[in-house]
Amino acid sequence: MTKKQSPVISFKNYSFQYRAQKRPTLTNINLDIYPGERVLIAGPSGCGKSTLAGCINGLNPCSNPGEATGELIIDGVDATKSSIFELSAHVGTVLQDPDGQFIGLTVGEDIAFSLENSCMPQDEMHQITRKVAELVKINNHLDYAPHELSGGQKQRVSLAGVMVDQVKILLFDEPLANLDPATGKQTIELIDEIQKETDTTVVIIEHRLEDVLWRDVDRIILVSEGRILADLHPDKLLATSLLGKNGIREPLYLTAMRYAGITLTPEKKPSHADRVALPEDDVKQLKQWFQSRMAGKQESEREPLLEVKNLSFGYTKGQRTLQDVSLTIRKGEMVSIVGKNGAGKSTFSKLVCGFEDPDQGEIRFAGKDLLTENIRHRAKHIGYVMQNPNQMISKTMIFDEVALSLRNTGMDEAAIRERVEETLKICGLYPFRNWPISALSFGQKKRVTIASVLVQNPELIILDEPTAGQDFHHYTEIMEFLRKLNEEGVTVVMITHDMHLMLEYTDRAIVIADGELIADDIPARVLTSEAIADKAYLKKTSLYDLAVRCGIPDPSGFVERFI
């Protein structure tokens, strides 16, 4: 891409401070983004990247009051003197949670919403709606209700809804956070196709760096503590140690190369696993590292804790969300359940917790029939953390939310305070203990819900997407805490789209596709099986691609030994 003379987004000595905060969230930002560029903004939670995005689309200060100093020009418009309505004609925003962006009762109504507001003639409105729907490949679902769509389809509708205004800038706020790996890959491909078709400027805020880099980006803007720490081409940034030092996960294949003692340089093209250019000496070094690693040890059989036999369930008559699922979770295991959106993973957890009753099958916990027990009894032994934290939170303040279940048991207030504060420290929430929950980000709310379950000391914890919306620092903090809990005897089951989590933290992966259990194996074998990956909408790990590219004869073994 050739840079044009005038930037479409231009920050000059720009700072922003929320009215409720004592210090600026953004300090002295100088940044130019040019027409047609694709830019990734990365940084740890709370670094200011979402605030930066909010300044671009006008949410700050129009909806979130605060004081801005310096200059911000968006597509020739002075953003500091413009309304959010004026800026929306230039910037289209796709939110992290697409459910929060739906307005219409059908897909077609939702896409056409802004056109209706501008009193466009119906014939012209229908023509534009159909054209944009075709561009995002959702044209066969115009009569569907939003709740009938998958997560990836909802993202497409949200994108279409902002594209009808023919905006010059598309801003994506963590578009992959709630998507399975294959759908996330398709989303990045869609963004790539749309940008090539429309020459739109694309700004992406995302923690899943490796997934975004599936297609080229021009620059990565690294934000830390409200300042721009780096503004570099991906190959240049990935050759440094800046990502790890600032709480951001680098692509897994780069970690493997570093483990092998390989020096990364921009010339080796480290931003793509399938294009990385390693000289023969580096390839030899990687092979020697692989041969020196010991294969993982087999663990002895453990006592069964949760036993499921021939479990079937459907939300509507004649349709099965789960079909004849049988599995055993043993005491002290740390297990991942993976599969595409809508495969039946969350439904399985609802049946175990008693939120739904199965059509047929058995569920036993520690040898006892769970189907004879109510939800309250099951909750004494099984903790469940939902994917959407807003569906769990019922109190205004953080401390009160985490303390709620203990107070319901009549526990002494001093004992409650001690246990709650200990849990908040573990989850990285202690400094915010007296904050209102409304002031938290999506990822912080997620940690509140995890804390509210962990405080009860359950025998089995089921977590639905525990790391969604978390930066690498908080991801590692939560996962290391869960690993510590697991080492102390708590059984942990995680429903996840995060293949890194599955590889690094679990010894076993249960794969569900279209309501059926299709695999139950070690994660390395699951993520190196093309048949399983395709059927379950997973994505083969980049470690496998690196091993194949370097001619390692046993790519699956390479992945297993790396983990």
Name each model-derived stretch.
Residues 57, 353:
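Helix-to-loop junction immediately C-terminal to a conserved catalytic motif
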Residues 227-253, 516-543:
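Conserved beta-strand-loop-alpha-helix hinge in the C-terminal portion
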Residues 123-141, 414-432:
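Conserved ABC ATPase "signature" region
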Residues 42-44, 338-340:
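The feature captures the beta-strand-to-loop junction immediately N-terminal to the Walker
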Residues 170-173, 461-464:
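Catalytic Walker B motif of ABC-type/P-loop ATPase nucleotide-binding domains
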Residues 145-149, 153, 436-440:
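Conserved ABC ATPase signature
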Residues 65-77, 361-369, 378:
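Conserved ABC transporter NBD signature motif
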